[in-house]
């Protein structure tokens, strides 16, 4: 009976009026902002995470120790706290110099930067695990044949590591789209902030939040569909390798497959492995 009473009190006319048509709704703009922040923050997190992962697997303590400390801080503190520190605490700590104005005076920039820095800490471990999962014997063989370290990384290690890195990376894209809701605490006009603005004006709390939930579901469904397509493509690549079929020209160009490495010196007689 209570559930029926709750359902009866739900204002469907308000819900559908706000939800449709979407081009008349501020939620559409907020949803676009969520996608934009997600794309920028996650991509920046991947790039920074790759750099940090190289430091993480380095044997040089000058590279490894700072990365360990970075991961300790960003993985050990709440994301919401980091957002508040970046937007509100940084200005007080530094005296708000002009150079920090783009961060301390723009909530979108501060929020996106914090999300990227936080995500880099998690992408570091994902990328590190992928890089270290590649058979060390392949790396040793390539080095023994005279391939430069950079070529070994980008022609042998990275293409194989991507099969491990890509699935959790797209999960991180989906998580990032939901983490943008935390930016409502610093007045970034994303979906949750837009819903809060609506229900402070018309007092339809549940209906306003329900509209935001629908938009979040649309965004996560869209990202999930992309994830499945990319994972399917990686599955096809694996089948091609097993079947011995040649890779398409664009793929050979990206990975360097089938190209002669000029850094390799000497020849190896047939049936003999050069070590």
Cite the ranges covered by each PLM segment.
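Transmembrane alpha-helices and adjacent helix-loop boundaries
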Residues: 1-275
